[in-house]
Amino acid sequence: MSRKGPRAEVCADCSAPDPGWASISRGVLVCDECCSVHRSLGRHISIVKHLRHSAWPPTLLQMVHTLASNGANSIWEHSLLDPAQVQSGRRKANPQDKVHPIKSEFIRAKYQMLAFVHKLPCRDDDGVTAKDLSKQLHSSVRTGNLETCLRLLSLGAQANFFHPEKGTTPLHVAAKAGQTLQAELLVVYGADPGSPDVNGRTPIDYARQAGHHELAERLVECQYELTDRLAFYLCGRKPDHKNGHYIIPQMADRSRQKCMSQSLDLSELAKAAKKKLQALSNRLFEELAMDVYDEVDRRENDAVWLATQNHSTLVTERSAVPFLPVNPEYSATRNQGRQKLARFNAREFATLIIDILSEAKRRQQGKSLSSPTDNLELSARSQSELDDQHDYDSVASDEDTDQEPLPSAGATRNNRARSMDSSDLSDGAVTLQEYLELKKALATSEAKVQQLMKVNSSLSDELRRLQREIHKLQAENLQLRQPPGPVPPPSLPSERAEHTLMGPGGSTHRRDRQAFSMYEPGSALKPFGGTPGDELATRLQPFHSTELEDDAIYSVHVPAGLYRIRKGVSASSVPFTPSSPLLSCSQEGSRHASKLSRHGSGADSDYENTQSGDPLLGLEGKRFLELSKEDELHPELESLDGDLDPGLPSTEDVILKTEQVTKNIQELLRAAQEFKHDSFVPCSEKIHLAVTEMASLFPKRPALEPVRSSLRLLNASAYRLQSECRKTVPPEPGAPVDFQLLTQQVIQCAYDIAKAAKQLVTITTREKKQ
């Protein structure tokens, strides 16, 4: 626990003397100024604790000091040791530099962008590389070399990697070898102490069987780290995990007679909000609990920060962290909810924590929901029996009545104005917080629906105006085509259609090229005989593709009609096969399809051109032609043959896979924006893997035609995306590559994948509701 080492400790980021904070996940010590930047990055980048004023498990503090003294900082500053980097102007921050922008930019580049970490020479296949690194980590944790394991983790090794041959995770190996510090490092990077091996034994079992009882007890504490931290935040006590794993504080106020009405909200709305918390799925409840855990960490660090800083110089708006930073791995909705936790006052936040602890205990023990009125009556009876000696009680439970609070945190907890009672109810106080959050989300959704309705109305007006213009131009075009002479007798509609498609002498011309919408390049196949106005109506779509992906994926309950006007039959659901004459891949048809794919958003005023030989195909049909010509469809599409299966996966699973697809597409789009064409191939492999996993959720032969159509489009687009991305590598060295055209094709394929995924989410949600 001592901070004194064999050599003087300095800040890892600016070399300031006597650092007071530690970054647990990076294994370095930092000064106050640099710590303010670390806190603004978020726990997903750097987990910080004060060395003297925060509560530390002894082995965790020993792990941090071991890494710091053994040069863990060189992992994050590897390239700065290269003289070439010094000559290029890249340098480390100094203590005299300003926090903003010099220190902050350096720290963000160092830990968030990993700009100075040693890069592996070959990154073509990230999946194979990560697997090899994880196997090295699996072998290294049996030794005491922490720096090697941290270096492997920084390069992408997985702390929860399950070795396929040995049937264990790295934490199993560290527990068996008694490597406590290695186990601490693995847990910091997400290793699960309760994960079973191939025989169902956990790392805790390994440690006990090897005689490492202290390590086994520490792993149990790590397994209950979340609930222990929440309980310790409220009352300064933790369960000993021998008599029980949970302490459930209860709000109380002994100094007032009307304590129950002031400490608990007994309204019907509060009871409904409590029931909604209990009705959450395990995954959503875990996410909520982790978000509250991060908020507890932020508030505790805030309290230490305000107690230790010189308020006249350091405590400024820039150094403060008023809410949880954005985590790009989470959805926008979850990030907004995480930031709103900072608006809870102390009493509201304590009530939310009690509810989470009660619900966690109930779920872990498998108890059924109890009546809230029974709990309230029991709480009221216990409240009337309390003495009136203190305003605030320490909190204990029936399963841990003999444990004393930690001495290092006792003084801090006594200064908190919290009202606690000794109780071990499996159901805590009813709170309004969940109801308020849902109410705010509902108001936001309603406002968005109103806005979309207005946009829909304006687009409908614009559509009608365009239809009138098209009819007018069509009439003028017909007049210009008529040769001078006697007026011909009126013809039937079918004859007029033939006259439009046929020129003098029976020769066919290209049909009128319509202005393809930039919002919906993937237009569906249209039936014959439709007017150009109808075709434009089916092709118009009011939103950009990126908006469509975000709103459609994460707001699946909003009616699809509010997002777009386009309706029609997709290319994959046309009742004729690719081998039919309608979809025959002639040379000119292929060239025309390629041209339409490249100029999908361009408009042309040449109304005298007609299409030769090809029916009215949308862009989606053209892409279907290209796939048939180039690759004769991917074999994955053939797997959809077989008996009809009416089953559908759960909406939750489909949304999870869709989020993974969207995340990989966003990574590909970032690479395109940054002109990182060498990243196209690995990104397309990730997208193809995510698409394959998503398609595997559905039956081989779905009964619903829309599902089959969407799956065909999803698989075909993913396969075409791979083919386009492989074109970044020229077949011959030095051969020119049109990266601008290639990028357009890649973005188009990515859009088609996102659209197909959105359709599957919408269909699954609709079918599950019926």
UniProtKB/Swiss-Prot annotation:
Modified residues (Phosphothreonine): T373, T401, T546, T610
Residue list for modification Phosphoserine: 368, 371, 379, 384, 394, 397, 419, 422, 426, 507, 545, 570, 580, 601, 605, 639
PTM entry text: Phosphorylated on tyrosine residues by PTK2/FAK1 and SRC in growing fibroblasts. Phosphorylation at Tyr-392 is induced by activation of Ephrin-B1/EFNB1 and catalyzed by SRC family kinases. It is required for the interaction with NCK2 and for GIT1 recruitment to synapses in hippocampal neurons.
Gene3D superfamilies: 1.20.5.170, Ankyrin repeat-containing domain, Arf GTPase activating protein, Nucleotidyltransferases domain 2
Record region (Interaction with PCLO): 245-374
Alphabetic keyword roster: ANK repeat, Cell junction, Cell projection, Coiled coil, Cytoplasm, Cytoskeleton, GTPase activation, Metal-binding, Phosphoprotein, Repeat, Synapse, Zinc, Zinc-finger
A single GO cellular-component term on record: presynapse
Residues in coiled coil: 449-483
Protein name per its UniProtKB record: ARF GTPase-activating protein GIT1
Organism, scientific name: Mus musculus
Gene of this entry: Git1
